[in-house]
């Protein structure tokens, strides 16, 4: 798996965590098997007795859908920003003014 594939898989795992409640059962099943359990398209197709192309199309469309949700709701983006601020805050415990700035930024995310 290349670096780009790994980054995409990690991103899709996060997006799935954030937006799975907005997906149909079939969409959830396909994404979970493909991205979380590392099933191949053929394995998923065999499991659900459909073609590889049907699985591929569903995964691609569902991936586009969760990306669309993210562009509108930005849950993952805000999560990443909060995580970044948390790490900066841990490093700034002895710098109260800097810590206050990070807290303000964190509050603005809500």
Swiss-Prot record:
Coiled coil: none annotated. InterPro entries: RNA_pol_sigma_r3/r4-like, UPF0122, UPF0122_fam_protein, WH-like_DNA-bd_sf. Disulfide bonds: none annotated. It holds the Pfam family UPF0122. Might take part in the signal recognition particle (SRP) pathway. This is inferred from the conservation of its genetic proximity to ftsY/ffh. May be a regulatory protein. Belongs to the UPF0122 family. PANTHER family: UPF0122 PROTEIN CBO2450/CLC_2298, UPF0122 PROTEIN YLXM. This is UPF0122 protein SERP0802. It comes from Staphylococcus epidermidis (strain ATCC 35984 / DSM 28319 / BCRC 17069 / CCUG 31568 / BM 3577 / RP62A).
